């Protein structure tokens, strides 16, 4: 049942495929019903955060999972989106809900500018540069007058009860998570998806066979940055406050990478598996250890998974189903005449 749920796309039209998609629909209906009738503030808030991270992880998955570019800078564009909407409200009185698309476009434009030099790098060099850029943008936000420095920017809270606010963002992030997951699924089965996988497997060979690798990477990066920027704008309105240290926290990028790597990079199901797992473990560790120790633990987890479970949970499931199918195919038929 577990494999049917997370691998519904195999054997299209088969009974197991239909059952897998039916289970996903049932889960979505259950989440919608809980959003309507649930009254536990903590659960609504926690699930809203899960949905928000699902969106960020799916966005990271475009270039990081399918393209194989390990990016530790997703929080940079999340923060740019958050600050864009906060600045537009603070100086011009514009609503975050109206400026969310503008925040996404601003983050995408920043992603294009940063991507022009950085996407020519590969491997550890690219990963290191994305980390440096995150800290550089954080320092910039601390120093600039328009961002109000370390004080940050306050935004008016919505005229709703705390339960009403969390219910609103529960549905906003759930809807966005569904939309982005469907988008990633469509890209995975498109020419762009195949091009990204070709880049991940062998970028030089992909160029030789005609894949326009630079343009594909720029497009995937810009789309990922746009999504992160919109999420950042919604997050800013949710907490009604942005400041450099928390908004550009490196832990956010680290969590996103962990969620994708543990769930299964390069699959649309990976973020749906990895996000709740990482958040659950992170909450447990937060009670026991300091944030510095947590970073060390998570870094070790990434290394172990990269070395011994490169496909994450989805990789394990896919290999198990493949072995199961092979064993069934090799079993001699019991029907003899």
Please give the residue ranges for each predicted region:
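Transmembrane alpha-helices and adjacent helix-loop boundaries
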Residues: 1-337
């Amino acid at each position: 049942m577990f494999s049917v749920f997370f691998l519904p796309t195999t054997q299209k039209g088969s009974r197991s495929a239909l059952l897998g998609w039916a289970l996903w629909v049932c889960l979505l209906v259950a989440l919608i019903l809980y959003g309507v009738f649930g009254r536990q503030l903590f659960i609504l808030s926690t699930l809203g955060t899960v949905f928000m991270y699902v969106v960020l992880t799916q966005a990271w998955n475009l270039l990081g999972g399918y393209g194989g570019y390990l990016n530790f800078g997703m929080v940079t564009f999340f923060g740019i989106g958050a600050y864009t909407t906060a600045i537009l409200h603070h100086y011009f009185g514009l609503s975050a809900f109206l400026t969310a698309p503008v925040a996404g476009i601003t983050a995408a434009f920043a992603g294009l500018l940063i991507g022009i030099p950085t996407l020519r790098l590969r491997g550890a060099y690219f990963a290191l540069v994305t980390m440096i850029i995150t800290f550089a943008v954080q320092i910039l936000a601390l120093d600039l007058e328009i961002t109000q420095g370390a004080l940050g920017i306050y935004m008016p809270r919505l005229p709703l009860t705390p339960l009403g606010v969390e219910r609103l963002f529960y549905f906003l992030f759930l809807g966005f998570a569904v939309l982005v997951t469907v988008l990633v699924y469509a890209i995975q089965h498109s020419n762009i998806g195949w091009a990204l996988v070709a880049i991940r497997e062998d970028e030089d060979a992909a160029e030789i066979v005609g894949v326009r690798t630079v343009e594909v990477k720029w497009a995937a990066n810009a789309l990922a940055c746009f999504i992160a920027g919109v999420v950042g704008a919604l997050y800013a309105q949710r907490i009604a406050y942005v400041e450099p240290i928390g908004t550009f926290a490196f832990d956010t990028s680290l969590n996103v990478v962990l969620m994708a790597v543990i769930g299964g990079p390069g699959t649309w199901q990976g973020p749906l598996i990895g996000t709740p797992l990482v958040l659950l473990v992170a909450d447990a560790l937060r009670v026991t250890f300091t944030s510095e120790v947590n970073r060390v633990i998570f870094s070790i987890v990434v290394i172990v998974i990269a070395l011994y479970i490169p496909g994450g949970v989805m990789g394990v499931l896919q290999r198990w189903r493949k072995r199961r199918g092979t064993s069934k195919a090799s079993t001699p038929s019991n029907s003899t005449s």
